[in-house]
Curated annotation (Swiss-Prot):
Belongs to the SMCR8 family. Component of the C9orf72-SMCR8 complex. The C9orf72-SMCR8 complex associates with the ATG1/ULK1 kinase complex. The gene is smcr8a. One of its GO terms (cellular component) is cytoplasm. Residues 280-298, 433-454 have a biased composition (Polar residues). Residues 421-432 have a biased composition (Low complexity). Pfam families: Folliculin (PF11704). InterPro entries: FLCN/SMCR8_DENN, Folliculin/SMCR8_longin. Residues 272-298, 418-454 are annotated as: Disordered. Residues 316-753 form the cDENN FLCN/SMCR8-type domain. It comes from the Eukaryota. This is Guanine nucleotide exchange protein smcr8a. Keywords: Autophagy, Cytoplasm, Guanine-nucleotide releasing factor, Nucleus.
Amino acid sequence: MIGSPDVVAFTKEDDFGDSFSDPLSLPDEFSVPLFTHAANANPWTKTSYAKFSKDFILISEFSEQVGPQPLLTIPSDPKVCGTFDLNYFSLRIMSVDYQASFVGHPPGSNYPKLNFVEDSKVVLGDSKEGAFAYVHHLTLYDLEARGFVRPFCMAYISADERKIMQQFQELSSEFSKASECLKSGNRKAFANELEKKLKDLEYTRSVLHKETELQKMNNGCYSTQAIEKANELANVEKSIYEHKDLLRQITSYPSRRKRDVDFVQCEAEKPPVMDETLKDTNPSDSAENTVETESRKSSYTPQLIKAKSAKCFDKRLKTLEELCDTSFFLQTLEQLNAVEKSFRGDLCFIYTSQIDRALVSKQRVTSFLFEAEHDWEDGGASKNFSIPSNNPTIPILNFSGEPLSLDSYTTCIDVDHLKPGVESGEGPPESSTSDITQETSEAADTETKGSFSSDKSIEALGSVSPSSLQTNFFDGLERRSKISIPSYSDNASSSIAVPHRRSDGNLVQMDAACCIGQDGFIFEDPLPELAQECCGDTVVNQEPLSLLHGDPALQMDYILEESPNMGLTFSELNTSVLSEEVAKINIEDVFDRTSFMSISTSSDRAVSPFTYGSALTVKQKKKAGHSALRFIRQYPFAQQAISCLLSGRTLVILGVDEGTVRKLVNALFIFVPNLGKYGETVQPWLSTPFQLTDLQRWKLIGLQRAVSPAGSSILHSLNRYSRYISILDCDNKTLRCPPYKGTLISHLADHRTQIKRGSTYFLHIQGMLTQLTAKAFLYTFCHHIHLPMDINDQGSVTSRRTNFLLQLGYTVEESKIIQYLSELIKQHYIHGSAKVGNPSFSFNYTTSYLYKI
């Protein structure tokens, strides 16, 4: 009988440690193996096994002396390439005869012919190196090279194969533009080199001709020396004809390329810009330029060409920069740097950005509110809307220092990156992004603004009798009043204008405590449909309703427009027929105070995103997100300030320190609707009294508090327009504005937010503002809530609008934001981005409260 020790001896050692196996557990063959952890390993990207850290652009050449070699990388940081073998990869991408171009003596031709072959585009991959590349082959011309050609290629190298394949069309388009720019500069340099070589050959021919004549005179016509000189002269003559034919070919290239579709597209994509220095030229300057050009052309000294040239491997080949014109070469590098930045990052991010741009381009009706304007938007705007007739034309490239045979040589690539001119509709207003101070007020021109008038036709006050003025003083109170600023006359006299048609209901008296200027009357030609809706002789003690074709939800909406005519001056107005209260008003108060404009020279300013002549970028707005995040955490009344900006109420930031004021402006400008490409609706620093037209133009103003006569006038303007603006005193940490009760802005600006990065908070703001814009778009174009059922029943329109906004989930205060955005969308839809129509100036008869920390 076998005992227990023998049984134990025949058992396996592992059987004693077996635990119970769960039958419901996942089998091993279906389990995912763990990722092998390494120092810089990333399981979510294919660059983990590549020898370079991020994508880059490689420019290589197939040199006839040393073979394929890398020339430069973009970016030029050696850390980007890492241990990646550039020489090996250059050999891979340059080892194929990709174009099979023929340059030599074709059949039936005595001279070499330049074949302008098209670029080739291929995709190569090296799984061993973990690199995939989009390769763009091109040919440049060099007079000293074999066959006059120098093969080059530009490659976008990435570790993500899907990025190369899915973005092939975009890469091909961008690299084609860079290649065309590089080849245009090369053709220009090649033509210059041909001209110089022709001068050398002609000089050599003249020298050889003289020497040949001397040999004939001394040794006879059949001497050895004379025969050698004659053969050498014949070779020079042949070379001259060949170089002239090459020059003819290279200069006739653009005329053929202009018929190509790609060339036309490349030419059309250039913005119509022109250097400001080219506008104002006089005959003397042009004469000097002509003399200078002629001196440059004659500055080259011809050289004698030796009979035997250097060997192929003894001569020095030109570098890529020497093969091209300097300006074209630098422009090509800028384009390639832009390509590298645009395709940088993950494929998902690039694809999402492209979808975003495509969607934004289709939503131009609302994208102007909070989205950054792009170059393609400018191009679209220039096609859809009118362009000023005085725009300068695009200058043709002037190749100074070139022979006369190159005068017809043109190209589709502009030489310089010229800054866009500050034109109407294209750039910022004259004073929108520049700082306005009173430092050089004595040298500035004085501007005198008139009072408010109607936008209709104007004639003298004699058509209105004084009795009708006094009797019907309160008659014809309309639910909406239109105010316009008359244009400046030569004598700068102010006027009160009267409408064309006489009516008993065209004169409205405004309460001195709540009228726009507290200084005059508003004359309006009443509408026919409202002729029977005039009020009685009662004092205005309640807020008026809105006009029929206006927005009834807005309590009062004034439209400021420029009138081409001037009305009656104050000297012609008989104030005895007016009421006693109006007669006591100082006449000087009717005139807007003179503004003195100058460029501030203060050097101790804080960093501001507003730079004159440059567009605001998304990067600057992301930086402003950090300032906005800090603002809502430091100021408890941040929601009230943001509510004023979103509802169209001008916010004035008052302070002594310019740096503090600019920081607050920088924190709040991302909440301003219709900011503009250049920040036209924001004035970061103002040291003069602002006017009513400034409130119409600027929605965020940084105002200087100064202890001076200018400071007292600034405080006077604040008190004068205090009912129509909100004032944030950064010195006393107070805010005077109407109250806000709602939940929309509490989600937008919550001081308890867990967001810590400014860029993240900017994306949060952008998302919520986009949602708000979508609701405003829906409110604007839902026609059934704006069209009245009956012309006499306007209450139904107001109730339908109110119910519609309530269904969207907005309170009364939040509805004001939707209505203001809706008005901006209407104006943009009618007038376009050219901003032909003036924006509306709206305010509410509500009480302002003082908020303190």
